Amino acid sequence: MAKVIKHEIFYPNPVADVWDYLTVPELMKQWLMPNDFQPVKGHEFKFTAKAMPDFDFDGIFHCKVLEIIPYEKLVYSWDFGPGNGVLNKSEVNWTLTEKNNGTQLLLVHRGFSGSEMLPIFGAMDKGWLGNIHKILKLLNPETDATTTA
């Protein structure tokens, strides 16, 4: 059975401010990792991280922008693995909604199937939760947020 990561968080900030943290490479690097992202449908880009041999991960996430609706939705592929041509394929979906003078952000990451994916699923689930809270702290150093998984 496939596992899905799902987190929702409220930011007391305008949608445009949250959107920037999802689409501006320099801001993305502050809460996620170095990248060559461009907010253009079809753009192929990479996130680079420390290799994790225990997870059979070479340190590179190979991505492609699949859908983009400015200030509303961003979807990209998120493929990773040992770098030998065999990649684990997944998809990251961000949805932003204006709510109560702020932004409701929904993150859904799909594509974790098979028992061999359980360790990476757990690591990614925890990682995404921490990362969306990093955005909150970058936007509002003095504020806390609520999240639901």
Across the structure, where does each feature detected by a protein language model lie?
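Intrinsic-disorder/low-complexity, polar/charged segments enriched in Ser/Thr/Lys/Arg/Asp/Glu/Gln
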Residues: 2-8, 44, 60, 73, ...
